[in-house]
Amino acid sequence: SIEQVKKNDIRAFLAQAGITPVKETPTGGMYLSPIKEDTASFHVDYTKNLWYDHGAGVGGSIIDLVMHMHNIDFLDALCYLEEPSLVRVQ
């Protein structure tokens, strides 16, 4: 289901893509934006499992992140996130 896909951990997804935080607290991390890689304007809330890119003015769930990172639509993002090689929430 879509709700199950949204539970995929954004932090683990970014780590699997080789994207690590520039600054981190127990509840969130600041990253170089995977959408617009110029400054550490990309925030991930680890508690809510949501992201926001202050430079691009966009944010949302892991589905939205995949859509923006790969310039694909909603259905393609769902298919992408259903790949067995991706990190899953236990």
Predicted regions and their residues:
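N-terminal structured subdomain of primase-like DNA metabolism proteins
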Residues: S1-Q90
